């Protein structure tokens, strides 16, 4: 019985045994030009790469989630312009929602040492700020690929709900993202 199954479906069996093809090129093909910065090569690798994303760095959190202190949050075009200027996307696909907070990186890092709270999706891996903070919620209204993403800017004042990630090198939790700005009373 088993022998007849193997003989009848030999091609399917061989296809299952094949190794997946590795993509050629990527960001490394640009390294031969010599005058391209390492930061740009890292950006290309993140956008075009097929592996897992790199853990967050202080620079990345500042770029992605910390609001510009001199720019008013009530600006109607805040989200559309900031998302474009800061390159907030996932492999050039528009991000459906995003948050910018008016806090320092040190404050977010301090939040990572707070007790665990429920995230919006119900998992227990977020941290909730004890003080109200100002921020902006960006909601995608139009577009699906950069640079055609247009966002609605919604000002919020509430408690920040952030996610943190363990950093092995320093043996501490560091900020990873913003889950929500919760309006608690």
Where are these regions (language model features)?
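Short, structured protein-protein interaction patches enriched in aromatics and acidic/basic residues
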Residues: 121-141
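N-terminal "domain-start" segment
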Residues: 2-127
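Compact beta-sheet-dominated globular domain cores
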Residues: 141-185
